[in-house]
């Protein structure tokens, strides 16, 4: 075991993201909200965001409701965009549970889909969620990665089944967006309520999607792996 011999040679190298694209450009409303509290220093120095963690801000209900208004606005914008560009109809008042990333077995989109099948069967039994859920997937598979393509096929089949089931549709919606890319991610990330970061523990070196979602106010649902570990340490439970 090389770690026992040279523990100092084994350490993490965290990736990073650019605020210019994933906050300033993607979510100008949230940018203005933050600037109103702490100025614009955070645009060049992420450490400035720590100034938000003060009782004056965290216990200000009026401002916290403003955050909810911004999130609702971005969700409505996403719903309109998907309707106009892809013909996909989603409920902007539902919980947006989003998993967008490269399609790979270790990233476990298939596990997310299996949970949604379980949720579908629960609703059929009469166990309806108190708040509707919209599960959104965005991914592309490598050309020769057959299993990844099969997972996409499974998600699309689930989407079609739910779309044709009037008993389930009001409570659960599954969407696989077409041609997932950066432009679409700029719409999806600010609208997200729950960020799915469920890669198999020990397989994710860092990840950056988790950072983009966290920056835009989503709650992370994830394994204790990659940059999720550092996010957990900073944000807590």
Set out the residue ranges of the language-model regions.
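Catalytic binding pocket for nucleotide-activated donors in carbohydrate/polymer assembly enzymes
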Residues: 6-9, 14-54, 190-191, 198-237
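Hydrophobic alpha-helical scaffolding
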Residues: 20, 24, 64-68, 106, ...
């Amino acid at each position: 075991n090389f770690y026992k011999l040279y523990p100092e040679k084994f350490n993490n190298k965290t990736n990073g993201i650019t605020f210019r694209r994933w906050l300033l450009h993607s979510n100008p409303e949230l940018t203005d909200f933050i600037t109103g509290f702490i100025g614009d220093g955070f645009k060049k120095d992420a450490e400035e965001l720590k100034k938000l963690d003060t009782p004056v801000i965290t216990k200000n209900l009026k401002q916290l409701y403003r955050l909810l208004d911004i999130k609702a606005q971005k969700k409505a914008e996403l719903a309109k965009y998907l309707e106009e560009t892809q013909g996909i109809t989603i409920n902007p008042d539902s919980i947006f549970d989003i998993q967008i990333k490269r399609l790979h077995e270790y990233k476990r989109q298939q596990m997310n889909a299996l949970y949604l099948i379980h949720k579908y069967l629960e609703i059929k039994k009469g166990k309806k969620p108190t708040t509707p859920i919209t599960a959104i997937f965005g991914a592309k598979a490598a050309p020769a990665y057959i299993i990844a393509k099969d997972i996409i096929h499974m998600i699309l089949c689930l989407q079609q089944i739910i779309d044709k089931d009037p008993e389930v549709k009001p409570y659960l919606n599954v969407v696989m967006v077409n041609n997932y890319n950066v432009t679409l991610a700029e719409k999806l990330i600010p609208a997200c309520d729950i960020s799915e970061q469920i890669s198999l523990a020990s397989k994710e070196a860092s990840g950056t999607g988790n950072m983009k979602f966290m920056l835009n106010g989503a709650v992370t649902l994830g394994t204790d792996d990659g940059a999720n570990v550092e996010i957990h340490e900073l944000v807590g439970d």
